[in-house]
C-alpha cells in the first residue's frame, strides 16, 4: 500500500511539472503575439491605450505650468512649483515619467513594426491580409513619429546655427528595433538633431504611404 501511495505522489509531481512547462491558457508571449492578423489588431489597439497615457495629465499640464498663463497662488499648496520656477532637474520624478512614458510607446511600436515586417517578408500572413496590415503598420509608424517628436520638443534644444544639426548629443537616443534589456549601455547614445528629425520625417512618410494604400483599397 505504501508503495502505491508513493507512486501516486510521484505521478502527481510529474503532472504538475508538465503543467508548469505550459503557458497559462489564453496567455500571449512575445513569440506569438503577432502570429495572426487578429492578434496584430489587438496589439495595435494596445498602442492607443499607451497613447492615452501620454496625451493627458503631466504630459500636457507640465508644459503649460511653465507658461505665463499660470499664476501660482497660496491655495496651490506649492504643487509643481519646481516647474513653475524653472527648477527642473534630470532627477525630477515627473521628468523621468515623461521620458520613460514616450519610450514605452516607442518600444511597443518597434515590436509591432519589426514583428509584422519580418513576417510579411517570410510570407507568414495570408496574401489577402496585407491590406489590413498596411493600416496597422502605418499607424505604428505615425505613433512612433509622434512620440519622438514630443521627446524632441521636450528634451532637445532648438538649433541656432546650421552646424548644430550634426553635433552628436544634441538629438535623441534613437531606437528602432525591439530589443529590451536591463543593460542600459546597450542602447544608443544621443544622436544629432538631423538624425532625430530625419527619423521623424521618415516615419511620417512611411505612415502616409501605408495608410494611403489602405485607404485606396478600403
Residue ranges of each PLM-predicted region?
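Short alpha-helical hairpin
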Residues: 68-90, 174
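Extended ligand-binding groove/face enriched in aromatic
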Residues: 139-182
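Short, intrinsically disordered, charge-balanced linker/junction segments flanking boundaries
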Residues: 45, 198, 212-218
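Conserved, well-structured interaction surfaces
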Residues: 80-156, 187, 191-194, 206-216
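Short, surface-exposed recognition loops and adjoining beta-strand edges that mediate ligand/DNA contacts
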Residues: 34, 60-69, 127-128, 155-172, ...
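Sec-dependent bacterial lipoprotein signal peptides
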Residues: 1-16
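Membrane-proximal, proline-rich intrinsically disordered regions
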Residues: 18-67
